[in-house]
């Protein structure tokens, strides 16, 4: 019995060393659960792999969202308000939410009046791209459209 405990602990240590921490935690839980002894090895192993895989995907998504530096990280396509006065094309927004424009090497430019929800829309599209595991960087275009000092000097002449 003690040899088995040592072997299991050694296995857990190796999983942690290989950075399979979610799998190591799940393995500990499986070992402590008497009902798991009745589950076939292949099923138990599959559960461990699924847990590690899900954990890695979740961590990757969190990292992508954090690195995107969204102004509104809670933005969501599902929460967009399509009131008639806003003149939003729901079909177009749904199509853009699939992120096909990214595979086609296209960009999205969102224009509108102040307070119309441009930032929210941009963040919502960015969040959707993150959910498809694309790297996103949120940048305000104002930085790129303001005249340079050289342009201002030319306009004075």
Task: Name these PLM-found stretches.
Residues 25-71:
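Interdomain "pre-motor" coupling segment immediately N-terminal to P-loop NTPase/helicase cores
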Residues 78-96:
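N-terminal pre-Walker A segment at the start of P-loop NTPase domains
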């Amino acid at each position: 019995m003690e040899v088995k405990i040592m072997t299991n602990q050694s296995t857990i240590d190796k999983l942690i060393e290989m950075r399979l921490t979610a799998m190591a935690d799940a393995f500990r839980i499986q070992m402590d659960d008497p009902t798991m002894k009745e589950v076939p090895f292949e099923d138990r192993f599959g559960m461990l792999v699924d847990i590690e895989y899900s954990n890695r995907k979740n961590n990757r998504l969190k990292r992508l969202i954090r690195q995107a530096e969204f102004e509104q990280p809670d933005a969501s396509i599902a929460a967009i308000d399509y009131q008639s006065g806003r003149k939003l094309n729901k079909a177009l927004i749904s199509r853009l939410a699939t992120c096909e424009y990214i595979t086609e090497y296209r960009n999205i430019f969102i224009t509108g009046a102040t307070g119309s929800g441009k930032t929210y829309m941009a963040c919502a599209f960015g969040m959707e791209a993150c959910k498809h595991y694309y790297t996103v960087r949120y940048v305000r275009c104002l930085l790129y459209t303001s005249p340079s000092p050289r342009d201002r000097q030319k306009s004075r002449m």
